[in-house]
Amino acid sequence: MSYYFKNLKPGYESDEELEDDEILKTLSKRYADEDESASDDELSSLSFDALRRAERQLEEESRKEKAGSQNESKPALKNAKRSKEKELELADSFKAKSYTEESFGENSDSSSENEGLFEEEEVVRGNKNSKADHGKNRKKSHAPSEQSSKKKVSRIRKIPGLETPKSMNENLYQDIRFDKSLGKAEDYESIRKRYQFLDEYRQKEISELSRLLSDRKFVNKISERERDEMQEKLTSMRSKLQTLKNRDLDRKILKDYETEINKGNKTKYHLKESEKRKVIQKYKFDHMKAKQREKVMDRKRKKRLGKEFKQFSFHNR
């Protein structure tokens, strides 16, 4: 068989369809040639005046478009600049701290202690913005100013009722049972009644100390410093016990005097502080011995003379 018959393949299209395609191609070529010739004829028929007018109109329209675009672009540029500035300010506020890394090469100074570490550099803009924000947050001039909690208090106020008396040292240990700020506000009388049994123990301690100090063998064994400390302790214990007894006596005197005054009265009468002092002095003076009265009178006379002596004119120079 020849080569021609080997390469033959069956076709699905009929001969009529192929003929129709060829006709359509020829018609489309014809119409395209006619359109080109018509456009050439139209351009050739136009005059030079019409072409000039058309060019002028096109130039005017292009100028107007340029002017309008420039006017519109100015506010757009301003808005763009403002938006960029705002973005930069926000970025600076968010950047609280920036870090710079030191060089690790051979040229770096070996004497620097911070070699290989990051140095913190506070941004100036961030500090300015924070100060401005702090100023804006303060509403009025009479508003309270903000202060750090680490700052010490300038003045410690004394609360009435919680002050330590002059006789007590503030640095000494204070019993919480008698502290007004921690316990109930109770009278001295109730506390004294509750702990009056301690007087017996105090008296025993005083007698024991006095017995040891009177013993010569014991005194020779200890040093002079220890002996002086024991003597001071003995005197302080005796004075404390005596003050407690004097307070009990004063309270008893006033109680008896008020009961005598308010026997037949429905409304109770309470003495003033000055009257209480006078009643106590009168009772003690009446119940003193003759020698004790003389000593008290001499002490008062010296006190009065000292006051009068200070009032003389030569002391005021």
Swiss-Prot record:
Signal peptide: none annotated. Residues 1-20, 54-168 are annotated as: Disordered. Residues 101-115 have a biased composition (Low complexity). It is found in: Nucleus, Nucleolus. GO terms for biological process: maturation of SSU-rRNA from tricistronic rRNA transcript (SSU-rRNA, 5.8S rRNA, LSU-rRNA). GO terms for cellular component: 90S preribosome; nucleolus. Residues 54-67, 82-100 have a biased composition (Basic and acidic residues). Residues 220-248 form a coiled coil. Keywords: Coiled coil, Nucleus, Ribonucleoprotein, Ribosome biogenesis, rRNA processing. Associates with 90S and pre-40S pre-ribosomal particles. Belongs to the RRP36 family. Component of the 90S pre-ribosome involved in the maturation of rRNAs. Required for early cleavages of the pre-RNAs in the 40S ribosomal subunit maturation pathway. This is rRNA biogenesis protein RRP36. It comes from Lachancea thermotolerans (strain ATCC 56472 / CBS 6340 / NRRL Y-8284).
